[in-house]
Amino acid sequence: MASSSNWLSGVNVVLVMAYGSLVFVLLFIFVKRQIMRFAMKSRRGPHVPVGHNAPKDLKEEIDIRLSRVQDIKYEPQLLADDDTRLLQLETQGNQSCYNYLYRMKALDAIRASEIPFHAEGRHPCSLMGKNFRSYLLDLRNTSTPFKGVGKALIDTLLDGYETARYGTGVFGQSEYLRYQEALSELATVVKARIGSSQRQHQSAAKDLTQSPEMSPTTIQVTYLPSSQKSKRPKHFLELKSFKDNYNTLESTL
């Protein structure tokens, strides 16, 4: 009886150790999986290194091309010219359910205006990643075609643009027409200034390329009076006297 109890106690100890080891292994696996899971969530990059097991040159080329992705910015045209929703806007434009179409048209109007918002003279679709208001006001204060444009006109344009893009209020037909009028006026002023500046540059280049007419050369001869002809410099007289003395000395020898 005692031997059987000792055997059962030994079995219990073994079972306890086995179950304890199993629980410890399961807890270790669970904790490890949770740590790896949170580590993957916090990582911004891919779970597998880019270019894994690739040659060094190929891996560098992949990294260079991936670094250029963040500089790629594109904003497509919201409403195509043949969009069927434009017909609905023309027939039922006064209804408030179509206000989102006026917002889309307002953003596309920047593209259609062809105003050189960039100082380099390019015609961007829009100013992505920039504050349109501060950028346009900066152009107004610099030596660009925007210099001196009325602040009220720019404020009207920018208020309409920001309301159409970011605002939560009503942007219907009347707001769009007011915005379009300000945009057309600004485009007219800027294009007129660009045209006058180009004409000035062309006229200046034309003046530089034209060779001046050759005027006939005149030769002016000044005759000295006889009293001034006899006047010679003092050093010339001294040189002549030295030459005469030298000739006299040479003849005596």
Swiss-Prot record:
UniProt keyword terms in alphabetical order: Golgi apparatus, Membrane, Mitochondrion, Transmembrane, Transmembrane helix
Gene Ontology CC, one term: mitochondrion
Membrane topology: Single-pass membrane protein
Metal-binding keyword on record: no
Transmembrane segment boundaries: 11-31
InterPro entries in the cross-refs: C1orf43 (IPR010876)
Pfam families for this protein: NICE-3
Gene Ontology annotations of biological process type: in utero embryonic development; phagocytosis
Locations listed in the record: Membrane; Golgi apparatus; Mitochondrion
Keyword Ribosomal protein among record annotations: no
Domain commentary: N-terminal region is required for phagocytosis of Gram negative bacterium.
Function comment: General regulator of phagocytosis. Required to uptake Gram negative bacterium by macrophages.
PANTHER family documented for this protein: NICE-3 (PTHR21425), PROTEIN C1ORF43 (PTHR21425:SF2)
Name of protein: Protein C1orf43 homolog
Source species taxonomy: Eukaryota, Metazoa, Chordata, Craniata, Vertebrata
